[in-house]
Amino acid sequence: MNPEYDYLFKLLLIGDSGVGKSCLLLRFADDSYLDSYISTIGVDFKIRTVEQDGKTIKLQIWDTAGQERFRTITSSYYRGAHGIIIVYDVTDQESFNNVKQWLNEIDRYASDNVNKLLVGNKSDLTANKVVATETAKAFADEMGIPFMETSAKNATNVQQAFMAMAASIKDRMASQPAAANARPATVQIRGQPVNQKTSCCSS
C-alpha cells in the first residue's frame, strides 16, 4: 500500500453542459470560483487528499464534458470509477429531466456497485429556481441514491457532497475487502502523474 494514502478513489462528475460541474470541482479542489468558466472539452481531473476516520483518502476527480458529441469519449472514463456524482442545475428544468438519461449511462458503462450521488447545483440562485427540492428528493429516493443541493459559488454543501461520497465508498470497500483487493481499479490511475492538475485541453 502506498504510504502516502490508505485509499485512492476515482470519482466522476457527470451531467449536462453548463450545470456547474467544473465549478464544483474547482471549489472542492482549490476552494476557488470563477463566474465565467470555459466549457470542459473532453475530460479534466484534479486531485485532493482528505482525512476521514483516521484514514487518508486520495480523491481523483474527473470532470467530464456534458456535450453530446463527447459522450463516446467520456464513456471509457466510467470504467474503474468508484463513485459518480450526477449534477443538474436547479434553475434548468431540462438538466434535471436529463438526469435519468445520465443514470442510464451509468448503468451501461460503470460497475454495478458504483456509488452514486445526485447533486442540484446553483442553489444560491433562489429567485430562478425551477426544480423544487422536494421533487428532486423524491426522484432520488425513487432511484435509491442520496441527494444534496449545492452552490459552487458560495461553497454551500460542496465539501459535504464530496466527503459524503468518499465515506460511502470507504464503507462499501470495508464491507467487501476481498472484492476490493481482487479488482485493483486504481492500478492504471497510479500511472498518471499525481501532480497533473491542469486541463488537458485548456484552450
Curated annotation (Swiss-Prot):
Belongs to the small GTPase superfamily. Rab family. It is a lipid-anchor. Its expression is weak in stems, higher in roots, leaves and coleoptiles, but highest in flowers. GO terms for biological process: protein transport; vesicle-mediated transport. InterPro entries: P-loop_NTPase, Rab, Small_GTP-bd, Small_GTPase. A lipid is attached at C200, C201 (S-geranylgeranyl cysteine). The lineage of its organism: Eukaryota, Viridiplantae, Streptophyta, Embryophyta, Tracheophyta. Protein transport. Probably involved in vesicular traffic. It comes from Zea mays (Maize). It is found in: Cell membrane. CDD domains: Rab1_Ypt1 (cd01869). SUPFAM superfamilies: P-loop containing nucleoside triphosphate hydrolases (SSF52540). Keywords: Cell membrane, GTP-binding, Lipoprotein, Membrane, Nucleotide-binding, Prenylation, Protein transport, Transport. This is GTP-binding protein YPTM2. The gene is YPTM2. GO terms for molecular function: GTP binding; GTPase activity.
